[in-house]
Amino acid sequence: MGLEIVVKDIQEGARAEVSRIKAEGDAKASEIINEAKEIQKKTLGDSLAKAEEDLQSLHQQVISSANLEVKRITLNKRKELLDTVYNQTVENIKSMPASKKEELLKSILDKHEASGARAYSSKESEELVKKLTSLSYAGNIDSIGGIVLENEDRTVRLDFTYDSILKSVYERSLKQISDILYG
């Protein structure tokens, strides 16, 4: 009988020990699970914050890119319009009445004929230039009108073609033209 009591005491002690170990294990497991949940919440929160930040950054990049594209398109359209105005001006010069062409050439020659020994002009203006100047006619040039004067030793050329005058005025006035067209 003494042995049964000892065995029973050992079994009860073992059961108590098992219960204690199990309770500690459950507590530790619960602690680990809670800690894991907290880490998961923090990680999820960090991930959401990062995703939101990345989304905001991407949104800003898309807006900036779109704004740049709009500016590029606007500038290209403005350039196209300015080029159209320039080309229309060239066409207006080409289609000037003969009397106006003569008047302009005479004005250029009156002011600058003394600076040259030879004159060049477009094929269309050749006869008119020969008529208006005593300078030697040196040949044709590719232009919409006007003349080029050259000195005796051919070291200096003065370009009074309508092409170069228009281009010079256009470049000097580009800002003003743009302001007039686009406010």
Swiss-Prot record:
**Entry's localization field:** Cell membrane
Membrane topology field: Peripheral membrane protein
Q: What quaternary structure, including any partners, is listed in this protein's UniProt entry?
A: Has multiple subunits, A(3), B(3), C, D, E, F, G, I and K(x); there may be a few other subunits as well.
Q: Name one GO cellular component term.
A: proton-transporting two-sector ATPase complex, catalytic domain
Q: Identify the gene encoding this protein.
A: atpE
Q: What else is known?
A: This organism has both a Na(+)-translocating F1F0 ATP synthase and this H(+)-translocating A1A0 ATP synthase.
User: Single Gene Ontology BP term?
Assistant: proton motive force-driven plasma membrane ATP synthesis
Recall the GO molecular function terms of this protein's record: ATP binding; proton-transporting ATP synthase activity, rotational mechanism; proton-transporting ATPase activity, rotational mechanism
The UniProt entry's sequence similarity note says:
Belongs to the V-ATPase E subunit family.
Identify the keywords attached in UniProt to this record, alphabetized: ATP synthesis, Cell membrane, Hydrogen ion transport, Ion transport, Membrane, Transport
Instruction: Name its species.
Output: Methanosarcina mazei (strain ATCC BAA-159 / DSM 3647 / Goe1 / Go1 / JCM 11833 / OCM 88) (Methanosarcina frisia)
**In terms of pH, how does activity behave?**
Optimum pH is 5.2 for ATP hydrolysis.
Job description of the protein: Component of the A-type ATP synthase that produces ATP from ADP in the presence of a proton gradient across the membrane.
* Name of this protein: A-type ATP synthase subunit E
Top-rank taxon, per record: Archaea
